[in-house]
Amino acid sequence: GFGAGMARFIVAVGHRGPMDAAFLGQPAPDPAMFGLPVEDDGNRTDPLLGQNMPSCPHFEPDFKALRAASTRIVLGAGVESEGQMACRGAFAVAERLGTTPVRFPSGHGGFMGGEHGQPGDPDGFAATLREVLAQA
C-alpha cells in the first residue's frame, strides 16, 4: 500500500551510495517510523508511487538536444544530499551536459521549512536561487 511504498521510497532517496545487493536485500522499513499508514487500502493511484515511479527510471533525456538548446540549463544539488540519489542524478546529468551543478544549502528539500517533516534552509535556498536567476 501507500505507506509501505512511501517508506521504501524515503529510505531509497535518503540512502548514500550505490543501491547494491546489500542495500536492496534489507528488510522493508516500517511505515509507522515515518508516520505513514501501515495498512494496505488497495489504492495504487498515488501520483508519485503509482504514476511517476514506474516511468521515471526508464526516461533518458536527449542530451544532444539539451546541449544545443538556446536556453540555459542549471542543475541544482543540495550540499547535505551528497551521495544520495537526487544529488548523484544532478551530477550525472550535469556531466553529460558539460556543466557543474549549483550547490544549494541543505538537502534535497532545502526550500522547505519543516512543514512536511523535512526542515531545510528556505532563506539560504532563496538566496542561492536569486543568485542563479540573476545570472540569466
Q: What are the functions of these language-model segments?
A:
Residues R88-F91, L97-A136:
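Catalytic active-site module of serine/aspartate enzymes centered on a nucleophile-bearing elbow/loop
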